[in-house]
């Protein structure tokens, strides 16, 4: 009965812990529905996100992007010279060449789309354009301590928006 009402039911203690954690983290966010936006810098991850939105205890769907969202994401990709490599859709593989700013701007575009109720963002810390690793003499100033890194800017973006954002770091 509760599943039919939209509740997620934990099948075991580990699942309960995960659901309890998510409930605590997302308690201030308003979830309007089950339409997901999925962004990743790796193709396998975006496919995995799409394949994992239906389970025994819940079902979501990939939200259809509004034309304005598609245009905005295309602009971002053009500015990053990734437009020839990336097709705008949901889920979207924004390519390992996408930098922190691209991750943030595309997340924001998805958050503003009325057909998206929640966003999942995958970040690959080993991608060459992302500031997500410890400081290194090989890339001075281009690490997670940089104030322009996703580590510092994503929490601000999440705080400004009512929709939930889930981050995945591979």
Located regions from the model:
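Conserved thiamine diphosphate
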Residues: 1-13
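Well-ordered alpha-helical segments embedded in enzymatic catalytic cores
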Residues: 15, 19, 102-106, 149-153
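A glycine-rich phosphate-binding loop feature that marks nucleotide/adenosyl-phosphate handling sites
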Residues: 15-20, 41, 124-126, 169
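Catalytic-core regions built around general acid/base machinery
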Residues: 1, 146-161
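Structural signature of the thiamine diphosphate
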Residues: 10-37, 108, 112-113
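Short glycine-cluster motifs
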Residues: 3, 32-145
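Short beta-strand elements of ligand-binding domains
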Residues: 164-170
């Amino acid at each position: 009965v509760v599943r039919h009402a939209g509740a997620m039911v934990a099948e075991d203690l580990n699942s309960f812990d995960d659901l309890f954690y998510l409930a605590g983290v997302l308690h201030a966010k308003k979830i309007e529905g089950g339409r997901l936006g999925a962004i990743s810098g790796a193709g396998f991850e975006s496919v995995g996100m799409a394949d994992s939105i239906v389970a025994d205890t819940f079902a979501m769907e990939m939200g259809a992007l509004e034309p304005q969202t598609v245009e905005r994401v295309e602009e971002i990709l053009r500015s990053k010279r990734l437009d020839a490599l990336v097709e705008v859709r949901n889920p979207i593989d924004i390519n390992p060449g996408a930098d922190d700013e691209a991750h943030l701007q595309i997340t924001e575009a998805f958050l503003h789309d009325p057909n998206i109720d929640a966003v999942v963002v995958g970040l690959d810390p080993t991608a060459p354009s992302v500031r997500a690793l410890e400081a290194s003499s090989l890339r001075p100033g281009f690490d997670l301590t940089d104030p322009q890194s996703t580590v510092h800017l994503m929490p601000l973006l999440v705080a400004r928006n009512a929709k939930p954002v889930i981050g995945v770091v591979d």
